[in-house]
């Protein structure tokens, strides 16, 4: 079996052979490669194949299974970690950064880590009171939208409400839409998870250490909230223009409901100035 490693200066191949120890030599061939993407601001152009300092995934786990048969068969499975994952939870300015909720460094007494359903890539946080995640911003100033991927069994009348506190940023808050029914969350499907985004953008300074504290502010303790991950979406010009377009379309749809006959622009008789002001805001 061949293993490819890096010693920080070049890519090496380690060949393990029974009874003969290890042989290490430089790699001058490529059998297959996962996609190589630009993952840092100071990194050069993307390359077709992995190099010692430009690779997309790191081998993190191997498992083998022996299948009894006339000719014994050995099956191997490999688990990979994306190279953008790091202990500092670095938030990148040019990519959407995903941070698993289980990388939180502080959990409230009522919250806990629970096993994931198998399609989330890891475990989840059963969010009952609060948790904190510490991140490191990269070396450029940037504004972001922050969103979470979650599952919740709240109803229209018992929706969970969460607040996000970040030093130097006005507190953010939102109510979570229910995504599944019942109390059993051990076998949730992919469709039972949704994204929800905080409405206001946040701005981080270069190389800033950031603490994000999530709190539940509702009183519905029986409402389950499972947090999968937190995402930071860098706000580019195109994203901002797209959001403004969506906002205008939403306002137009609301305004259309005010007219008894949209073609003739006839306002409903019971419409008030307050309704119009709310639509404008």
From Swiss-Prot:
Q: Does the keyword Thylakoid apply?
A: no
A Gene Ontology biological process term: sporulation resulting in formation of a cellular spore
Which Gene3D superfamilies has this protein been placed in? Galactose-binding domain-like (2.60.120.260), Pesticidal crystal protein, central domain (2.100.10.10)
Looking at the record, which segments are called Antigenic epitope?
54-78, 91-104, 108-116, 131-148, 160-172, 189-196, 208-216, 221-236, 247-256
Gene Ontology molecular function terms on file: signaling receptor binding; toxin activity
- Pfam families the UniProt entry points to: Endotoxin_C, Endotoxin_M
The reply to whether S-adenosyl-L-methionine figures as a keyword in the UniProt entry is no
Q: What keywords appear on the UniProt entry?
A: Sporulation, Toxin, Virulence
Q: What does this protein do?
A: Promotes colloidosmotic lysis by binding to the midgut epithelial cells of insects. Active against Mamestra brassicae.
- Per the similarity annotation, which family is this? Belongs to the delta endotoxin family.
Which protein, by its recorded name, is this? Answer: Insecticidal crystal toxin protein
Source organism per UniProt:
Bacillus thuringiensis subsp. kurstaki
Q: What is the lineage of its organism?
A: Bacteria, Bacillati, Bacillota, Bacilli, Bacillales
